[in-house]
């Protein structure tokens, strides 16, 4: 079973993503509300996949992505963002994010991204 770390500063978004993934039989390994928590939890939990917001307090998703990939260059991270700025998305992909989801999103978009990244 695929274990996922869900990262978003908005609790309702973490809940929404968790519900979508659990309904599809993914296991939620943990949740974080900022990038610093995300990087720390990644090191402790070693999930198979991370869904991560970009705009967060303390440490944003781009900085957390860098930290996670420094620790584990093979980490699979899907960035979630309400920002439609191509520059930010391009930066995340160039750093090593495997995919991205634009908020607001439909359940199918989340599952399609997870499936692409996990190869199923």
From Swiss-Prot:
Identify the residues that the record assigns to the Response regulatory domain, covering every copy: 3-118
GO biological-process terms attached to the record: phosphorelay signal transduction system
Any single Pfam family the record assigns to this protein: Response_reg
Q: Which SMART domains match?
A: REC (SM00448)
Q: Which UniProt keywords apply?
A: Phosphoprotein, Two-component regulatory system
In the UniProt record, does the keyword Cell membrane occur? no
Q: Give the gene symbol.
A: ccdB
Q: What is the lineage of its organism?
A: Bacteria, Bacillati, Bacillota, Bacilli, Bacillales
- Which PANTHER family does its entry note? TWO-COMPONENT RESPONSE REGULATOR (PTHR43228), TWO-COMPONENT RESPONSE REGULATOR ARR22 (PTHR43228:SF1)
- Write down what this protein is called: Protein CcdB
UniProt superkingdom: Bacteria
Q: Which residues carry this modification: 4-aspartylphosphate?
A: 53
Species of provenance: Bacillus subtilis (strain 168)
Q: Which Gene3D superfamilies match?
A: 3.40.50.2300
Q: Which PROSITE patterns does the protein's record reference? A: RESPONSE_REGULATORY (PS50110)
